[in-house]
Amino acid sequence: MTVVEADGHYVEPFAVKNLFIYSGETYSVLIKADQNPSRNYWIQSSVVSRQPKTAPGLGILNYYPNNPRRPPPSATPLAGPAWDDVNSQLAQSLLTKARKGDKYHRPPPRSADRVIVLLNTQNKVDGYYRWSVNNVSLNHPKTPYLIALKHNLTREFDQTLPPDGYDFKNYDIYVKQNNTNGTTSSGIYRLKFNSTVDVILQNANTMTVSNSETHPWHLHGHDFWVLGHGHGKFDIYKDPLKYNLVDPIEKNTVAVHRYGWTAIRFVADNPGTWAFHCHVESHFYMGMGVVFEEGIERVGDLPTSIMGCGATKGLRLP
């Protein structure tokens, strides 16, 4: 099959036998129906990045008017890539680029005004496992950020700014860390309106020996350019020199692979508060996410119909 679109943007077409799709992503593919029309063919979906505990999902590709109940020639479909085949997963990510000549493609800004590095970790907080970013696990406040910021309800969330990075030099991403002292926070990143922001997603070992999981990160309110992917620890001096600034794909969800890194760039030009989080829902609710604020002063009056949570319960504002 040939991949032609990802997250609403045309890609330079490339052919694959297996397509890796992570939670929150969308793809369009073309399949050329040029095989023997008297046969049926297997379609299979499998879990990757975490050892599966369930059987693969199966379907049948049928040529009309061939009987769809006729089984394919083989009793079972061919096996796809192994669940932990990170090289194949990374190869697809590197192949996904903007379509040449696409008049809708926007080139990225040549440089960034701010760089934020987000280390994906697993921690224990009060004896419970939590997912974290830079060893800080996001706690969602009862009052929505947008309302709290617009109406200066500063007591409704932590005013301490989250860290822009971690101890790059000394943190070993391949080792199970003693992350039993993780902290929680509802603090947010405050971005200058219309600024260009680079975010480096760095994956690391979990609190299980020799274990790292793929995380699909999704940004609300924006599309971003995917500038690069790589194995191992991101080098803040060398790896930016390898960024793809020619034909990077625009997406809203991107994977950071096991023991790897992913670099994205976006323009903070949409007034409001926007979540950026792992799109594995349980990971987000367990703390793997951040919130960006940009241009809150440009947000118009908020309708009273959205009041009702936290400090806004029963609040009626003109």
Kindly give the residue locations of the regions a language model identified.
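Histidine- and aromatic-rich segments of cupredoxin/plastocyanin-like copper-binding domains
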Residues: 1-113, 117, 121, 128-140, ...
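N-linked glycosylation sites
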Residues: 135, 152, 178-181, 194, ...
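Active-site-adjacent structural elements in folded domains
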Residues: 11-15, 181-186, 247-250, 259
